């Protein structure tokens, strides 16, 4: 299946799901009344090389993204709003995404940018709630920050970590990574 067709199907399924990715992840074009669900990058972006831990405590690298279509979302398990909403939206459309006929399977990858509190055990519990097939990753900030930037995403600890309930500001986009391990676009939230 070609890239354009797959992305169109992902967007259509998101719209049908009636959650985020149809309206919440959509933007309207000024010249066209048809919603544009995916902002494609002018050129595919090479992901920064990383070594991270998955929810099983296993070390993973960028090889995780090779041979798969990946929907990648940055967040953290203590996030009070956008993370559970986005993960629920991904969980809702994932069964339909898996049914898309493609040579490269689709995976959802949650990358925690808060390794202090998000242990592999906590990540396992978190992603399993939304779908046990989802992958969760975390690692040191020296790996996470360049990785996020390579996709055009950002995050920052918003307040003192002395407060046990501190927040982390982070991008709310879901990045699409192709089977070659290149970021090709993102679903951006709409801020109305």
What would you call each of these model-derived segments?
Residues 103-118, 133-142:
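Thiol-based oxidoreductase modules, predominantly thioredoxin-like and allied folds used
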Residues 68, 87-110, 128:
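Conserved helix-turn-beta segment immediately C-terminal to the redox Cys motif
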Residues 124-171:
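Short, internal strand/loop/helix patches
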Residues 84-94, 120, 124, 141, ...:
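Extracytoplasmic/secreted envelope proteins and their assembly/folding machinery
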Residues 60-86, 90:
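Short active-site neighborhood of thiol/selenol oxidoreductases, capturing the structured segment around
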Residues 1-49:
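N-terminal targeting signals for export/organelle localization
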Residues 36-72:
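Short extracytoplasmic
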Residues 161-192:
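Thiol-/selenol-based redox modules, centered on thioredoxin-like
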